[in-house]
Amino acid sequence: RDIGVTGVQTCALPIFDLSPADVAAICDRRSGIGADGILRAVAADRVPEWDGPGGIWFMDYRNADGSIAEMCGNGLRVFLRHLAEQGLVDDTADVPIATRAGLRTGRFLRDGRISTTMGPVTTGDPVTIALPGHAWTATSANVGNPHAVVRLGSEGELAGLDLGTAPTWTPLEAYPDGVNVEFYVQRTADRIHLRVHERGVGETPSCGTGVVAAAAVACPGGRCIVRVLGGELEVDLTGPEAVLTGPAVIVASGEYRLAEGDAA
């Protein structure tokens, strides 16, 4: 079954490397474990591309198709939960985590949720996002990874979207490495409903960076409650960095045996 956290299914694995084919096999929902992505916990000192502080953990995130992603907001919380349950970090103090999008900090709250810094959010030029028979003007946003955020007019329009097909965009050069696309409906000044199509994955019950990107467009400079298919998350945009808060639960653990020679 899925191994997940609040609407996003991720697997936390040991430090040996994995090929894209390994990742895709593990994430396959019929022949593997089934997941939206894989998290590898690696000592940051062992990661050549990391030039920040040492003595901390690096979150190596892979999409379900095996591609490398800069960041996963919901994955970051389950990563922290995994490290805490394994006794690898102190859950009574703020915990710095290295990611491809930069340094992030996690905080374990008394109510069981976890807050994480998500870095600054930047918005850019409008782009056109299209699905078969429909096109919308979207706002570009960056949360350490690329997003295009579309505001819709009604709950019916949101519910009626067919996200089984990946959205396309113009101009093509806006997102040379692909883009995560968020569709939202504004319910109140500080509450939105959201659906997400993640690059390399498809529609997911939630996407932490997508939640932050949509909140930044819908509730700039404020606080926002975002309801996704997997539940509700809170975004605080009042400071220099966005802060994402939500639950993170380890629902299963076990062993997965790769075919001999599969692991890189």
Predicted regions and their residues:
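Anion-binding (especially nucleotide phosphate/pyrophosphate-binding) glycine-rich loop
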Residues: 29-68, 90, 172-201
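Single conserved hydrophobic/aromatic residue that forms the stacking wall/gate
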Residues: 1-11
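Acidic, low-complexity central loop/insert segments
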Residues: 64-141, 205-207, 216-243, 250
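Short beta-strand-to-turn element immediately C-terminal to the catalytic PLP-Schiff-base lysine
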Residues: 12, 41-42, 109, 149-153, ...
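Anionic-ligand binding region
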Residues: 125-141, 148-174, 178-182
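Short, basic/aromatic-enriched C-terminal tail that caps enzymatic domains
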Residues: 243-264
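Intrinsically disordered, low-complexity, positively charged segments
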Residues: 12-37
